[in-house]
Design a protein with these regions (language model features):
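Core catalytic lobe of class I
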Residues: 1-211
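Short, conserved SAM-binding/catalytic segment
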Residues: 213-224
């Protein structure tokens, strides 16, 4: 589970580096990341990849999804709509709409499209043995983020969003491990710990690592 780094804005959104890339370079870079996901993702696991379009390149998410599907072992299983509590209004634009929602794309291996794991519960079993499941909507209403960290990272999501996603795809068990390759300020880890599963994260920004570790220490202190 992760929120993809920028890549399509004129200015960097990380404290450590300028994350802007040309669209072709960005798509190739992302496909390479997904090929690495294929090496570490458990059987029938999922990749929850959050990103939205930008005013600079609104077509990029759709081009990126197509590039991933065409150049990796992954395909789209579902698209979750995340409705944020606040959004960019673009008051100076005569034609751009207010972006209230973002996407969370659910990627699975192509050969596991019929077997990937969720927490959908059986509602009944028919006389022929056919199982019927409680519906789970592809819509989440959640906070934007956990507070202002713009001086370090302008692209964060909320613990609220993380826990709602985990409720559908993860087990609240220590043995269930979530990996966030762009950990940032530690929101994925924070959500995992509150939900009850484990998390491994990587991050190149030393400052953000320190911030994330402090958040984790605070959770341990609170629960002791």
């Amino acid at each position: 589970m992760t929120k993809r780094p920028g890549g399509d804005a004129d200015s960097g959104r990380y404290d450590e580096y300028n994350d802007w890339k040309e669209p072709k370079e960005y798509m190739e870079w992302t496909a390479n990341i997904f090929n690495h996901f294929d090496n570490i993702l458990v059987e029938n696991g999922v990749v929850l990849y959050n990103f939205s379009y930008s005013i600079e390149n609104p077509s990029l998410p759709y081009e990126l999804v197509a590039h991933i599907v065409n150049n990796t072992n992954f395909c789209i299983a579902d698209t979750i709509i995340w409705k944020k509590k606040a959004s960019m209004p673009y008051p100076a634009s005569p034609n751009r709409l207010q972006r209230v929602c973002e996407f969370v794309f659910v990627f699975v291996r192509k050969n596991e499209i019929d077997s990937f794991t969720t927490n959908k519960q059986i509602s009944k079993v028919g006389t022929t043995g056919q199982k019927y499941y409680v519906p789970v909507p592809n819509f989440i209403d959640a906070k934007n983020n956990d507070g202002a960290t713009k001086e370090m990272n302008q692209a964060t999501y909320s613990t609220d969003l993380v826990k709602q996603l985990l409720k559908t795809y993860a087990k609240p068990e220590e043995s269930f491990v979530v990996f966030d390759p762009f950990m940032g300020t530690g929101t994925t880890a924070n959500g995992c710990m509150e939900y009850g599963c484990s998390c491994i994260g990587t991050e190149i920004s030393e400052r953000q690592c320190e911030y994330a570790n402090e958040r984790i220490r605070n959770i341990f202190t609170t629960t002791e």
